[in-house]
Amino acid sequence: MSDLSHIRNFSIIAHIDHGKSTLADRFIQMCGGLAEREMEAQVLDSMDLERERGITIKAHSVTLYYTAKDGIKYQLNFIDTPGHVDFTYEVSRSLAACEGALLVVDAGQGVEAQSVANCYTAIEQGLEVMPVLNKIDLPQADPDRVKEEIEKIIGIDATDAVECSAKTGLGVDEVLERLVKTIPAPTGNYEDPLQALIIDSWFDNYLGVVSLVRVRHGRVKKGDKILVKSTGKIHLVDSVGVFNPKHTATTDLKAGEVGFIIAGIKDIHGAPVGDTLTLSSTPDVDVLPGFKRIQPQVYAGLFPVSSDDFEDFREALQKLTLNDSSLQYTPESSDALGFGFRCGFLGMLHMEIIQERLEREYDLDLITTAPTVIFELALKTGETIYVDNPSKLPDLSSIEDMREPIVRANILVPQEHLGNVITLCIEKRGVQHDMLFLGTQVQVTYDLPMNEVVLDFFDRLKSTSRGYASLDYHFDRYQSANLVKLDVLINGDKVDALALIVHKDNAHYKGRQLTEKMKELIPRQMFDVAIQAAIGGQIIARTSVKALRKNVLAKCYGGDVSRKRKLLEKQKAGKKRMKQVGNVEIPQEAFLAVLRLDS
């Protein structure tokens, strides 16, 4: 398709479960992207994990051809985006390739915090946002209330928002009609030198690196020599094409289009996401503004159960980072667990997903340590350092001040659950910043310590509000706090992988809880196992896993008490000797016991 005015690039912004992937299925069906027999629910969620959890993790792209009612054939390039708070970076990447976005809102549930955050990102990037009310067929749908909410909370006009039901297909054609009228056509020139933005890359064992690109200017075809701006390397293009939704090769990709380029790049870091591609004959083309690199919020150690898997693990991480640019990792070693990597994630869900992908796609057995956030330390020497691993914390006598990261959290909650949410925020050491009443919903803004938010805040928020509250947060600042390092000792030996940094007020409580939890998880040995929690040299909690013991008196049948005592003493001496040389196997669950502490 040659005419730029007939191309529309758009993505869908929606909260989890508001029907985004189902609407995408309807678009594909209506535009004849797949035959009836190939249609399945959530076509674009191609990862098994995405289907099981019912969430979109990666951004996907599809090119569809839609003939409008006025007879014009439009090329729709649709980039699917995730809705969960941990994957906002995927959203900003997708939006960088679009001119417009559909804001899909569940007509029963109304606006949720995550859609608000993503919608603002779209507006900041200058996109045209078009509201769509989905699930209009449900009995609890209340379109008028939701339209009012969109106007009040997000501030865009929703009086004539399109109403549809992606599940039944009702009104979906109207969405497409409105879309081609509302969303602007891309700008660009075929004759200019090639300038293309890499939106996503992934590694294919046969093809090498496959890059999803948005062409801004010029054109690219098979046989062209392309230059990757950041690495300065030149590659020969093997094939170009689009997804509709299957891989379909085309003769070329032109300005305004979104598609894939395969150039036989074997180096995993050969085509970084957010980079600019151009032809080798025009190397002085300007670099396109990429998207801001997202800093990880949560760090955890990942260790292979068998040390022989270390190299495979390194390779698997390299391949995953290509596809998921927000994952960061550095090698680390632990006395308890051997060699592994310290990985940075965007949140707890992201961490779980990465661990599952490593175990499934690369067949690895991993142990994960408890996640922590980054702390800022002002040392007495005057320098400032950042620590993401409790076992790397310097001696307390050399620290002038410890600061913890604070996030600004926006919570949208129905009025009847407001009390529970406020109680939860206070329990998590939150400070209220603002409260707005918007129709039946309330928007509360809290400053919360990130350490409290990343572990289980999201789950607790959902359960206290019966699933109705929604959360969006971003890092705000570092703030001084009275923090201490909580060590766990097993039989008198510190286990570095179990150390935690906690607030002093909670330390005794956390220590008691942690030792009790460990007692349940560590299996009984042939000798007593002492589990202690300590701050510095002071033991604040202790519990023991009692030894398994054989009844040595069974053969005595009455007999003299001194004979019995002799047998018991002999057993005791044996147990003592075992304890000195015995090793305690700590199961994987014990390393994650920290996550299951009720804060």
UniProtKB/Swiss-Prot annotation:
So what does this thing catalyse? GTP + H2O = GDP + phosphate + H(+)
Instruction: Tell me the Pfam families matching this sequence.
Output: EFG_C, GTP_EFTU, GTP_EFTU_D2, LepA_C
Q: What is its EC number?
A: 3.6.5.n1
- One Gene Ontology cellular component annotation held by this UniProt entry: plasma membrane
Membrane topology recorded in Swiss-Prot or TrEMBL: Peripheral membrane protein
Q: Care to name a GO molecular-function term for this sequence?
A: GTP binding
Specify the tr-type G domain's residue ranges: 5-187
PROSITE patterns in the record: G_TR_2 (PS51722)
Which residues of the sequence carry a binding annotation for GTP?
Answer: 17-22, 134-137
Its BP terms in the Gene Ontology are: positive regulation of translation
The UniProt entry, under CDD domains, shows: EF4_II, EF4_III, LepA, lepA_C
Write out the entry's keywords from A to Z: Cell inner membrane, Cell membrane, GTP-binding, Hydrolase, Membrane, Nucleotide-binding, Protein biosynthesis
Q: What class of enzyme is it?
A: hydrolase
SUPFAM superfamilies noted in UniProt:
EF-G C-terminal domain-like (SSF54980), P-loop containing nucleoside triphosphate hydrolases (SSF52540)
Any idea where this protein resides?
A: Cell inner membrane
Q: Which NCBIfam families match?
A: lepA, small_GTP
Q: Outline what the protein does.
A: Required for accurate and efficient protein synthesis under certain stress conditions. May act as a fidelity factor of the translation reaction, by catalyzing a one-codon backward translocation of tRNAs on improperly translocated ribosomes. Back-translocation proceeds from a post-translocation (POST) complex to a pre-translocation (PRE) complex, thus giving elongation factor G a second chance to translocate the tRNAs correctly. Binds to ribosomes in a GTP-dependent manner.
Stated family? Belongs to the TRAFAC class translation factor GTPase superfamily. Classic translation factor GTPase family. LepA subfamily.
What is the official name of this protein in its record?
Answer: Elongation factor 4
Source organism of this protein record? Pseudomonas fluorescens (strain SBW25)
Query: According to the entry, what is the taxonomic lineage of the organism?
Result: Bacteria, Pseudomonadati, Pseudomonadota, Gammaproteobacteria, Pseudomonadales
